[in-house]
Amino acid sequence: MTRETKKLFKVKRKITPLTVLVPLLLVVLLVCAVIYDNSRIVLDEVTFSMPTLPRDMDGYTILHISDIRERLFGAEGEALDETLGDSEYDIVVMTGDLVSLAGDDTGLCQALDYFAAKQVPVYFITGEGDPPTTEIRQDGSFGATAWAQNALDRGAVFLDVPIALNEGERKLWLMPASTLVLDTESSIASLDARLLDENLDDGTVQSILYRKGRYEAFADAMAQRQQNDLTIMLTHMPCLDASLQSESTTAIFSEADLILAGHHLGGQICLPVLGALYAENDLLPRGGWFPDDRYMTGLNEVNATYQYVSTGLGTMYGAPLNFRLCNPPQISLITLTRQVDA
C-alpha cells in the first residue's frame, strides 16, 4: 500500500467538546468522592460473643479508636459527635499512632476533651509512629513527654499494665500485648543491678525506678489473674498467622479472648472488589501487596484467636498521598454479649 493510499484510508479523529468533558467530569467526580470520603467518619458496629462473660457485663460496649495521626475532630469534638450521635459506650480504647507524623497531638487532645466531657474512661497504647511517653529532660529531670502529659492531664490512662474492668469472681482484663514478652523477674533484677551504679544522675535513677515500678505493677496484676478470667488485648500491630506460629507468641496471644488492633489503616488506598492495594508489613505475603482482608479490617479469626482490626482515622503517608481511597476513616463500637448466636 502506497503512502497516498494510506492517506485515503486514514481516519481523522475529531476532538469534540464531549470527548474532553466526559473524562474531565469523571476526574471531578472521583476527586469529589475522595474529598467526601476523607471528610467523614464511619461507625462500624460489631457484636462479639463471649459466653463466659460475667452477667453484669453482658452488653459491655467498647469504643475502639486507632491511628488518629493528623485527624482533627473540632474544638468541641463535632466530628465525633456527628458520627457517634446517641451511641453509648462504657470505655474508649485507643490502639496507637495517636499523633501526626510531625508530632502534633491536636486531634488526640480534641478527642480526649470530648470523652472527658462525657466522663467516659479512656485507655491508650502507643504505636511505632508515636514519640516516647517518658523522657529525661534537658534539666536532668525525668517525666512524661509533652504529648503524653497532655493525654494524662485529660484523664486518659496509658495502658502499660493489665487493668481489671470489673470486680467479682470472673474478671474482664484489659491488657497491653507489648508487656507480655517481659520476663519481669529478670528485668527487675537487671534494673536493681543498674541502681548500684553510684555515678547515675538523678534523671536516670528516676527513669529506672519508674520502669521497675511498672514491672512490679505488671507482675502484681498477672498474679491476680485467674485461669477463668477473660482478656481483651490491645496491640497496635495486628497479629498475623505467621506471627502466631512460634511457641512464644502463641503462648502470649492465647491469653486473649479478643485482640483489638489497628496500624494498617485498612491499606489506606483500596480498590473496588480487590480491596487494599498495599500494606507495610514484612510478614505479609507478596511483600504486602494485595494483603489478606483478615489483617486489614474487621473481626476475623487468626490462628484460633479472634481479632478485630480497625481501619483507623488517619493516613500513613505525607502529601501528596495523605488521603484515603475507597476506605473512609473509621471508629468502631464493639459490644460484648453472652449470647452464642450474636
Which role does the model predict for each range below?
Residues 1-56:
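N-terminal membrane-anchoring alpha-helices
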Residues 3-13, 19, 311-342:
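A short C-terminal boundary segment appended to hydrolase-like catalytic domains
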Residues 35-37, 62-78, 98-106, 131-142, ...:
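Acidic/histidine-rich helix-loop elements
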Residues 49-63, 156, 162-176, 181, ...:
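Beta-strand-turn-beta hairpins that frame and shape the catalytic cleft
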Residues 60-157:
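Membrane-embedded segments
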Residues 63-66, 91-97, 121-128, 159-161, ...:
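Active-site neighborhood of phospho(di)ester-bond hydrolases with catalytic His/Asp-centered motifs
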Residues 134, 145, 153-155, 168-234, ...:
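Binuclear metal-dependent hydrolase catalytic cores centered on His/Asp/Glu-rich metal-binding motifs
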Residues 238-329:
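Conserved beta-sheet core of the metallophosphoesterase superfamily
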